[in-house]
Amino acid sequence: MLQLYNTLTNQKEKFEPLNPGKVTMYVCGPTVYNYIHIGNARSAVAFDTIRRYLEYRGFEVNYVSNFTDVDDKIIKASQEMNLSVKEITEKFINAFYEDTSALNVKKATLNPRVMDNMDDIIKFIEVLVQKGYAYESAGDVYYKTRKFKDYGKLSGQLIDDLEQGASSRVDDIDQDKKQDPLDFALWKKVKQGEISWNSPWGQGRPGWHIECSVMSTKYLGDTIDIHAGGQDLEFPHHENEIAQSEAKTGKKFARYWLHNGFVTIGEEDQKMSKSLGNFVTVHDLLKKVNPQVIRFFMSTTQYRRPIRYSSANLNEAKVNLNKLQTAYENLSYRLKDSVEGNDKEVEVNFANLEKDFVKVMDDDFNVQNGISVVYEMAKQLNVYSEKEKVYTDTINNLINTYKKVVEIFGISFSEEKELLDDTIEQLIQERNEARKNKNFKRSDEIRDLLKEQGIILEDTAQGTRWKRND
């Protein structure tokens, strides 16, 4: 039974989508004014892993993730770079696709943009005004926070506590325009030099929170199965989305709320963020680290937990990933000398491991326990590859199951164009052990396996050297 931790109720709940077998999932996407950093990518990877697991479990997932292409930060960046808002956003949307593709994040069913949905945003705000949940003030439109009686139900914030801190979050001009300090902007009056659209309230642009309410309900319906994003979006962004959407439709906005943990950096485990200037972009990291290693590093921590970014943790991910790939290479190679038939006992034991994997992953996508099962699978591949007699059907059965499970983490051995250096070193070490133990059959197998991958070995008095046969 698949259970999710629902932030709305602060407990694990049995997952039952509105329509059996089909899942609607909305993930808050990036504001496209710069390259994404590792913290941004964590959200994309975490929810891609969850999506992959849902699909593995047989669900059809309609996965929508937006691009915020109108925002104060984008306008500021366009002015600093002397580029149009459109030029800035196109550049960094393309960069986002390149970076996430390198990390093997599946493309969303749809990536809607704010600019493309402006008419719907304006209509949505008009309904809120007509229903008395919003009001115009000097060209701005604000949401009446107190009118929505369930405000705070996601984050646990109390209206009285919010009121005490409201003055510290808004400037004096906003205070003068608002009927209540807690009200938030749905539409902002145009300022000189800013991009704007015509509306019933004059020229302006949407506030941040309204866009996700509009695009999620437009493309997925009034009630979504899963709404997801970073923990920093829980309040006020997701809280405001609920207020806007449920005021308009009168229906529950999202049934399950999932929030991923931060990526931290440094000795004090600070949250990685652009505002703190302590970030590492995926664009830069990809120049130094294999993308599969980055993906594995981020996809093997349970989504609600923080991840500590460090060279040591990346290296650990690389070592573990190489072990998984080596196991795959070892058993794949034995297809050459395998015989027809199968080994039922081996296949049953491996099938039981897959059941163990499902059991732990069904517990709120516990990838840390899940990857432990995968390591045991890799161990069993190595054990079987060492057998004197191996069966073709069993090898194919084990490899297909193994690949199917590993691909949930975004790792695809079939797409590897060449072996990682560490994988080569590991195979050479295994070959040296085989030679030491006078297991020359295994030693020759590893040599031939590497040769097929274009790796030439040279045994010297100082040890085994290798080079790529380009």
Swiss-Prot record:
ATP binds at residue 274. Keywords: Aminoacyl-tRNA synthetase, ATP-binding, Cytoplasm, Ligase, Metal-binding, Nucleotide-binding, Protein biosynthesis, Zinc. Its cofactor is Zn(2+). A motif ('KMSKS' region) lies at residues 271-275. Binds 1 zinc ion per subunit. A motif ('HIGH' region) lies at residues 30-40. Gene3D superfamilies: Cysteine-tRNA ligase, C-terminal anti-codon recognition domain (1.20.120.1910), HUPs (3.40.50.620). It catalyses: tRNA(Cys) + L-cysteine + ATP = L-cysteinyl-tRNA(Cys) + AMP + diphosphate. Zn(2+) binds at residues 28, 212, 237, 241. Belongs to the class-I aminoacyl-tRNA synthetase family. This is Cysteine--tRNA ligase. It comes from Ligilactobacillus salivarius (strain UCC118) (Lactobacillus salivarius).
